[in-house]
Amino acid sequence: MDKVQQQADLFGKTISPFVASQPTNVGGFTDQKIIGGSETTQPPATSPPSPPSPDTQTSPPPATAAQPPPNQPPNTTPPPTPPSSPPPSITPPPSPPQPQPPPQSTPTGDSPVVIPFPKPQLPPPSLFPPPSLVNQLPDPRPNDNNILEPINNPISLPSPPSTPFSPPSQENSGSQGSPPLSSLLPPMLPLNPNSPGNPLQPLDSPLGGESNRVPSSSSSPSPPSLSGSNNHSGGSNRHNANSNGDGGTSQQSNESNYTEKTVIGIGIAGVLVILFIAGVFFVRRKQKKGSSSPRSNQYLPPANVSVNTEGFIHYRQKPGNGNSSAQNSSPDTNSLGNPKHGRGTPDSAVIGTSKIHFTYEELSQITEGFCKSFVVGEGGFGCVYKGILFEGKPVAIKQLKSVSAEGYREFKAEVEIISRVHHRHLVSLVGYCISEQHRFLIYEFVPNNTLDYHLHGKNLPVLEWSRRVRIAIGAAKGLAYLHEDCHPKIIHRDIKSSNILLDDEFEAQVADFGLARLNDTAQSHISTRVMGTFGYLAPEYASSGKLTDRSDVFSFGVVLLELITGRKPVDTSQPLGEESLVEWARPRLIEAIEKGDISEVVDPRLENDYVESEVYKMIETAASCVRHSALKRPRMVQVVRALDTRDDLSDLTNGVKVGQSRVYDSGQYSNEIRIFRRASEDSSDLGTNTGYYPSQDYATSHEYESESRAFNTSHRNH
């Protein structure tokens, strides 16, 4: 027991300058009391036991009440200490030596010595001494000469077991000597104040009991022995630290490279997505621009075909596109085998043709400089040339005569209408040309001239009755398509025999939409410019300019009268009062129906080579079409049904019996013609042929006016 006491005294003399501090002074090191070791001094009763030796578990030394408790070293966050446990005196936390020289005085005997310690300049107060004092700390382990050596390699020990220590036995003390100081001290790790990311955490310390215990890492090295292997262990620790540092740097570099590659990949993907969206946007915009014509309430295509008559092509409008025309969903060819025309460029958004745009040079080349020898007719607002395209297809080129605003509107109207209308009995538009002041429309060339040519041409064979019936039915179907199946309806406004073209099979095709107008309401349209041809004008249109679809019905009735009688609409070679076909035919039609004698109204050139029932049917149809009252006239659908079927013709009468319809008064008709002439006096379209081919004017305005005046005088005398 005495030997143990001596070792304790020696231990107290050795480390007392580093562990004694006032308990209340936590901010830093202050004056320390060092108790000199005497053989009679006992450790305090409340001091915890010293750590066990490597071989056997040690017990805390016996307690004594004579020694006062030492002060605790400074701590940034002082652990909670139970009030019943005063601080121990033997095993304080590791305290590396100050950079200053050793204490100025040493303890002698039992008298305490006060040694001032300067406060360390640490950012936060720590439980451990400044790192600069670690290398100067004297090694408390005794060597053979009992000389303290500095600790070269600070080591860290695992936390001691939580079980209470028992005092060391005499056998262990006698056999092994005094316990090593390294086993009694907590680990002293080098502290780097410049690395806040790696704070030094103390292991379990006997000063704080359970409250001061910090869980030790599983990778902590095992306690080194007191032999010379400490240096090797320290070098190994440094090597491991360097290896860990290199691994951390490599891992950070890999993470940085991965992050950089990820950012680059995301950027490239974003750019590709943006380019894809932009491409889709521009493609759709281009398609919309190329396939959609400007919205106009006046030029809209039909939604579908509803008339169940032979020769119609049934189209269906695409849903959701109010501007799409009937041709958008039409078959590749029409009923005549003509190719379906596609949409064009933005310059030709109103055109729907396969060859949408022609240059002026191209048209000049195929017409040899628009030579007069290529002229095949003169239309309502220009000449018509025949040309051969480069692929050998013949076309009819209609030139706009005037560059006025009215002529341009007519040109645009015809382009927009014809490009959207495709029917077996309607002329197809091939293309157009706009070059400075020149405007051209290119139509499919119909080779067999016009109905006017075959009916009234000189030195020509007589047109057979069967062909006349076929022509009447075909023209009626084409006109019915314009009225019934285009929305809004299209009013041709210049139906006449010279605007009905014939192909090689004598199938009729209605042409010349230069004077066409659209009627977008059920109400009549008042035109500011009366246009048409003498002999075909409806009375209400000639007198007031009121335009309806029944105006076209009246004009078509005049065409039927031409087919029946073979006479011209206005023939100045006829006797006075009989120059107008309508005035001459109406009383004779009524008489033929009542008496059953049609010999006076049928074309004598046929020489009775006709079907009488068909003649009667056409006579009744023509009589209903030329009624004075527009409301009493049938619609074109009824006309088609009357001509093309064997059904009863009662629907043509509209409640009017034969002979009860108001008959034209010759004087009244002449007055209406004079009003019409004054309204359109400046129009160059009147009295001209609007088809492809030339035909003679039926009457000059001078002759017609003088004859009408003479006829009115004789009529009043009667």
UniProtKB/Swiss-Prot annotation:
The active site is at D494 (proton acceptor). It catalyses: L-seryl-[protein] + ATP = O-phospho-L-seryl-[protein] + ADP + H(+); L-threonyl-[protein] + ATP = O-phospho-L-threonyl-[protein] + ADP + H(+). Mostly expressed in flower buds. GO terms for molecular function: ATP binding; protein serine kinase activity; protein serine/threonine kinase activity. ATP binds at V376, G377, E378, G379, G380, F381, G382, C383, V384, K398. Residues 168-203, 211-244 have a biased composition (Low complexity). Residues 1-262 are extracellular. Keywords: ATP-binding, Cell membrane, Glycoprotein, Kinase, Membrane, Nucleotide-binding, Phosphoprotein, Serine/threonine-protein kinase, Transferase, Transmembrane, Transmembrane helix. SMART domains: S_TKc (SM00220). Residues 45-105, 115-132, 157-167 have a biased composition (Pro residues). Glycans are attached at N231, N254, N257. The keyword Transmembrane applies. The chain crosses the membrane at residues 263-283. GO terms for cellular component: plasma membrane. Residues 1-256, 314-348, 683-718 are annotated as: Disordered. Pfam families: PK_Tyr_Ser-Thr. The modification Phosphothreonine is found at T359, T528, T533. Residues 284-718 are cytoplasmic. Its EC number is 2.7.11.1. Its main location: membrane. It is found in: Cell membrane. Residues 370-649 form the Protein kinase domain. SUPFAM superfamilies: Protein kinase-like (PK-like). This is Putative proline-rich receptor-like protein kinase PERK11.
